[in-house]
Amino acid sequence: MVSESHHEALAAPPVTTVATVLPSNATEPASPGEGKEDAFSKLKEKFMNELHKIPLPPWALIAIAIVAVLLVLTCCFCICKKCLFKKKNKKKGKEKGGKNAINMKDVKDLGKTMKDQALKDDDAETGLTDGEEKEEPKEEEKLGKLQYSLDYDFQNNQLLVGIIQAAELPALDMGGTSDPYVKVFLLPDKKKKFETKVHRKTLNPVFNEQFTFKVPYSELGGKTLVMAVYDFDRFSKHDIIGEFKVPMNTVDFGHVTEEWRDLQSAEKEEQEKLGDICFSLRYVPTAGKLTVVILEAKNLKKMDVGGLSDPYVKIHLMQNGKRLKKKKTTIKKNTLNPYYNESFSFEVPFEQIQKVQVVVTVLDYDKIGKNDAIGKVFVGYNSTGAELRHWSDMLANPRRPIAQWHTLQVEEEVDAMLAVKK
């Protein structure tokens, strides 16, 4: 029995032993994660093998990798920022409707726009409507009025003109006042002009001055009396406030005429251009020496038949209406733009320098007849405008020559100013 059972046991197949020996992966399929890990491991191993072949130290390779990554990130950042900026600009353009776009025409029209706006603001402050705006210029034409008198002395053939007073003059100065004076002259010759004294800071000056014109009664009817009110300006051209004209053939000289007349806007008469002259002034106080250098002239009036002139310059040193010294330049033939560069010196003590006048006259030389004056100008005591500035600059800069251009004036007008302002 024992032998039989033992024999059966030896004859039976070893099932359990076979089952334990078989591996699990032989009976179950591999998972996807495990396949990817194997591929990555192989790629990593291959990359490291190639990396070890490069003849660079590991730290250098790491630095190169970092720089490459930074470059890529920078490019991405710039691209994103540019896209966002374009979107913002488009939105702003749509919202604002192109208000920020200013062209050259807008810039050029800026001044005009501001001026128009200022006028509108003025109208708003005064409460004017559009309909009233058209009538406003008529009210602005009120320039004040002037009282005068006229008489004729038949025994002495003299026209007597009295300038009595002015009233309601407009304010032309910054302080809300004016410095008025009156010019009186006869047309058409304008040879003799008179001026009243300047009354400072007033709109209602009282003059009470009389002027005399020597005119035969037979010639008086063809003349017109002009009375013009000016605002005196020490450092620039005097502004005309207004004027009026009185034809002499409309005046009854059988009695004295005295009346008020409203001032009207002055007619813009084109003054005959006589030319310009340039000269320098230099004063040395310690030596009492005044030096005048006549440099050049330009655009002189044509005096000769051929359309040219033979100009030369006279320089007079004057005080209290008296000629103290006289000098003159050489004659420049056939030219309207002469160049001189000639120097003249005068002895003027320091205590007298503010009391003298330098009168510069440009004349046309004539061999046969009288030398005709082209134009004239004076600097020094009682000068005004550009002439006063030139004189003041000379005194403010002793020992230094100060050159300046001056516009020539009619000889008779300058002589009248010199005679009145003694």
Swiss-Prot record:
Cofactor needs = Ca(2+)
The lipid modification S-palmitoyl cysteine is placed on 75-76, 78, 80, 83
What PANTHER family is this protein classified in?
Answer: SYNAPTOTAGMIN (PTHR10024), SYNAPTOTAGMIN-1 (PTHR10024:SF239)
Q: Which family does it belong to?
A: Belongs to the synaptotagmin family.
Keywords attached to this entry: Calcium, Cytoplasm, Cytoplasmic vesicle, Differentiation, Disease variant, Glycoprotein, Lipoprotein, Membrane, Metal-binding, Palmitate, Phosphoprotein, Repeat, Synapse, Transmembrane, Transmembrane helix
Q: How does it sit in the membrane?
A: Single-pass membrane protein
Identify residues that carry Phosphotyrosine. Answer: 230
- Which PROSITE patterns does the entry link to? C2
Annotated GO MF terms: calcium ion binding; calcium ion sensor activity; calcium-dependent phospholipid binding; calcium-dependent protein binding; calmodulin binding; clathrin binding; identical protein binding; lipid binding
Positions with a binding annotation for Ca(2+) 3: 233, 236-237, 239
> Where does the record say carbohydrate is attached?
25
Q: Which InterPro entries match?
A: C2_dom, C2_domain_sf, Synaptotagmin
Cytoplasmic side stretches: 81-422
Q: Where is the composition biased (Acidic residues)?
A: 122-134
List residues, modification Phosphoserine: 265, 343, 345
Name the chain's protein: Synaptotagmin-1
Q: For this chain's UniProt record, which GO biological process terms are given?
A: calcium-dependent activation of synaptic vesicle fusion; cell differentiation; cellular response to calcium ion; chemical synaptic transmission; detection of calcium ion; fast, calcium ion-dependent exocytosis of neurotransmitter; membraneless organelle assembly; neurotransmitter secretion
For binding Ca(2+) 2, which residues are annotated in this chain's numbering?
172-173, 231, 233, 239
Q: What does this protein do?
A: Calcium sensor that participates in triggering neurotransmitter release at the synapse. May have a regulatory role in the membrane interactions during trafficking of synaptic vesicles at the active zone of the synapse. It binds acidic phospholipids with a specificity that requires the presence of both an acidic head group and a diacyl backbone. A Ca(2+)-dependent interaction between synaptotagmin and putative receptors for activated protein kinase C has also been reported. It can bind to at least three additional proteins in a Ca(2+)-independent manner; these are neurexins, syntaxin and AP2.
Tell me the organism's taxonomic lineage.
Answer: Eukaryota, Metazoa, Chordata, Craniata, Vertebrata
Entries under SMART domains matching the protein: C2
Q: How is the cofactor bound?
A: Binds 3 Ca(2+) ions per subunit. The ions are bound to the C2 domains.
Q: Where in the cell is it found?
A: Cytoplasmic vesicle, Secretory vesicle membrane; Cytoplasmic vesicle, Secretory vesicle, Synaptic vesicle membrane; Cytoplasmic vesicle, Secretory vesicle, Chromaffin granule membrane; Cytoplasm
Q: Where is this region: Disordered?
A: 113-142
Q: Where is this region: Phospholipid binding?
A: 136-382
